[in-house]
């Protein structure tokens, strides 16, 4: 059986909310797609909303859900505290709405707020254009003044599990600490056997989870991720409603995909630990560790090599025992000018070009960056541009592609 990721859209298809109508994806469950899908659960005693999108997406979600059912919003359930889940809270909730989140929501929110400038600047390379286009489209529909980003909040918290009954609908909220955030949870509808997992397994299902993000975040523990995958698999859902794209249907398919994902993360973890105990350095393991064919998963959002490094550093920290200088605040760039003076900018650039011509773009980047650190050398800049283009040609990963594209612009 082919891995499911091969037949589903990739990260490039993720886009801000724009739907004219909500889509009924299961009986009484409606989806408004966006940077993270928002879902509406209808009941005989009011509505339940799952996730609210970004602040500027709120009017879209509200409008399409109101067209389905205009009864009061009894609850808003937040599956994780990322901005694209909580931003539309103020637009989606009514005066008496209760917001429900996992008990770690304040811990997660406080991280985001204290690091807001840092994280915003480090995410811009991947999202700024997409956000600007989405905002412009929504402004055409709802006017120039769109709602600001809402702050995370919760009236009810879920420690491990919490059951709600709204009208005829039974809802179970289950903490999943191995999701993308420490306040992750899934929504389980036991009567329908539907699990709203959103981005618990990452924004595009069937791809290796990010155990750390290159935009900057705390490490995510591989064993906790495995426990979370198994917790959802044990529910035996017949429908999985994720954060993006169409539902995944069929108990056997869902079980097979969650088993594949669990075993892939376990394999990466175990091989990394074995390599550490054998005395191998992290870059060697990043190069060597690959999944067996039967555990193939996508790398459109996370990457195997990045997860190997995340597992290593989550266990071992930042000191790799490769150089005394790791312990001190003087990096290799401190002697770039010395190397350029000794070897010559042109000679280093020529050698970088030779590496590139022989299919070694990373070695080319190392040498060319020595030159550009001290001199705006046009030849070195051309090497850097072409080396990044070489890497981009082989990239299937959202974050890697965005970074490489931005670097190509920088050196053009």
Residue ranges with predicted function:
Residues 22, 45, 56-101, 157:
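Active-site metal-binding motif and surrounding structural segment of the metallo-beta-lactamase
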Residues 30, 77, 98-100, 156-158, ...:
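Hydrophobic/aromatic beta-strand patches that form the interior of the parallel beta-sheet core
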Residues 28, 41, 51, 65, ...:
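Divalent metal-coordination and catalytic microenvironments
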Residues 1-12, 117-118, 131-133, 139, ...:
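Accessory terminal helices/loops
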Residues 47, 54-56, 107-175, 224-236, ...:
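Metallo-beta-lactamase
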Residues 88-91, 104, 109-116, 121, ...:
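Short acidic, glycine/serine/threonine-rich loops at helix termini
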């Amino acid at each position: 059986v082919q891995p499911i990721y091969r037949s589903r859209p990739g990260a490039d298809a993720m886009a801000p909310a724009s739907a004219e109508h909500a889509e009924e994806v299961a009986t009484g469950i409606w989806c408004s797609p966006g940077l993270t899908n928002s879902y509406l659960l209808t009941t005989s005693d009011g509505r339940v909303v799952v996730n609210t999108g970004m602040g500027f997406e709120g009017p879209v979600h509200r409008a399409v859900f109101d067209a389905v059912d205009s009864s009061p919003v009894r609850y808003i359930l937040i599956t994780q505290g990322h901005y694209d889940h909580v931003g539309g809270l103020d637009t989606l909730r009514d005066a008496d709405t209760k917001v429900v989140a996992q008990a770690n929501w304040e811990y997660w929110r406080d991280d985001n707020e204290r690091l807001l400038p840092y994280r915003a600047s480090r995410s811009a390379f991947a999202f700024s254009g997409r956000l600007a286009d989405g905002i412009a489209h929504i402004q055409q529909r709802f006017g120039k003044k769109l709602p600001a980003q809402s702050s995370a909040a919760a009236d009810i918290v879920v420690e491990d599990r919490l059951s709600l009954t709204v009208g005829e609908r039974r809802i179970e909220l289950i903490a999943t600490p191995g999701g993308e955030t420490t306040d992750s949870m899934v929504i389980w509808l036991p009567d329908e056997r539907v699990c709203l997992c959103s981005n618990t397994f990452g924004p595009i299902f069937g791809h290796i989870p990010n155990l750390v993000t290159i935009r900057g975040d705390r490490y995510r523990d591989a064993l906790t991720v495995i426990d979370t995958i198994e917790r959802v698999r044990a529910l035996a859902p017949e429908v999985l409603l994720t954060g993006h794209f169409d539902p995944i249907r069929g108990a056997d398919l869902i079980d097979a995909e969650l088993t594949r994902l669990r075993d892939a993360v376990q394999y990466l973890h175990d091989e990394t630990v074995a390599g550490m105990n054998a005395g191998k350095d992290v870059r060697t393991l990043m190069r060597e560790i690959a999944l067996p064919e039967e555990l193939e998963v996508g790398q459109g959002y996370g990457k195997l090599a990045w997860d190997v490094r995340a597992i290593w550093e989550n266990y071992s920290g930042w000191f790799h025992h490769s150089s005394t200088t790791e312990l001190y605040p003087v990096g290799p760039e401190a002697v770039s000018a010395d190397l350029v003076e000794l070897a010559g900018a042109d000679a280093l650039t020529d050698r970088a070009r030779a590496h590139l011509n022989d299919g070694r773009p990373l070695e080319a980047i190392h040498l060319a960056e020595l030159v550009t650190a001290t001199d705006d050398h046009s030849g070195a800049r051309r090497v850097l541009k072409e080396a990044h283009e070489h890497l981009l040609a082989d990239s299937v990963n959202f974050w890697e592609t965005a970074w490489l594209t931005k670097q190509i612009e920088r050196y053009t």
